[in-house]
Design a protein with these regions (language model features):
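Sequence/fold signature of self-assembling virion shell proteins
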Residues: 2-13, 17, 22-26, 30, ...
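Intrinsically disordered or highly flexible coil/loop and linker segments, enriched in small
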Residues: 3, 15, 37-54, 87-98, ...
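Alpha-helical scaffold segments that mediate packing/assembly in large oligomeric complexes
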Residues: 8-10, 14-15, 19-83
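Generic detector of intrinsically disordered, low-complexity, polar/charged segments
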Residues: 50-52, 58, 62, 68, ...
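Extended, solvent-exposed, turn-rich assembly/linker loops in the middle of proteins
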Residues: 57-126
Length: 230
């Protein structure tokens, strides 16, 4: 269960409407709903990163060969992601990794790589009510999602999701997606209060006693070190 609430004053709502034409109630309700979605996103992504473990490390300072400019070195990330995707295929016998979740830093590397086949999504497709956005496709088959809350140095999450609902490393099962009380009056302060609640289950099949215990086979990771952009 996840709950979130907020309150405001009638004076603030009246002044905002009069001076700026802003509906404070609508803005707060939208912000609360967005915050719950963000928290669920971050919980799931964090759990998958933990499930993936350390993965492999790509040290940009130890790359061999003669590079022309920094974009040549950045191209190594796409190769390492392909290796991680193929490791998933070998472990699961289902398919290669078909999505990645990257930090803004890793996204910049993919965008600036000289030989990477990263195709950006068209403008307008970025809009979504989450903090994790679909930003393009790598090598024609791997969907790229950017986690805007990820700090520099956050490892790249590589995962596989099959065509069926059960062909996945983890399961998010909402049974009360989002419930709102609507604005209610606090009799002690004469302030409107609004609350949101969601209830869901989240499960990773890691226990071999009750399942195949192969959830970790569906995910991998690439850790970046000594990243340079010049």
């Amino acid at each position: 269960t996840r709950r979130l609430s907020a309150r405001w004053t009638f004076e603030a709502a009246q002044d905002a409407e009069s001076m700026h034409g802003v509906d404070v109630e609508a803005e707060i309700m939208q912000a609360l709903a967005q915050e719950i979605v963000v928290e669920i996103d971050q919980e799931i992504i964090g759990s998958l990163r933990t499930l993936a473990g350390a993965g492999t490390t790509l040290d940009f300072s130890s790359l061999s060969g003669t590079s022309i400019y920094v974009g040549d070195r950045h191209a190594a990330l796409a190769i390492e992601i392909n290796r991680a995707a193929n490791r998933i295929a070998a472990r699961t016998r289902r398919g290669a990794g078909n999505y990645i979740v990257v930090s803004p830093e890793a996204l910049t590397i993919l965008q600036s790589a000289s030989t990477s086949t990263f195709a950006r999504t068209t403008e307008g497709s970025f809009e979504a009510p989450t903090n994790t956005k679909f930003v393009g496709t790598l090598n024609g088959s791997i969907k790229v999602f950017a986690d805007n809350y990820a700090a520099d140095g956050t490892k790249v999450l590589v995962g596989y999701k099959g065509s069926s609902e059960t062909d996945a490393p983890a399961f998010y099962c909402p049974y009360i997606p989002l419930m709102s009380t609507g604005p209610v009056m606090d009799p002690s302060s004469f302030e409107p209060v609004v609350s949101f609640m969601t209830r869901y289950g989240y499960k990773e099949l890691t226990n071999t006693a009750s399942s195949l215990g192969n959830a970790a086979d569906y995910v991998d990771a690439v850790t970046l070190s000594n990243v340079a952009f010049q």
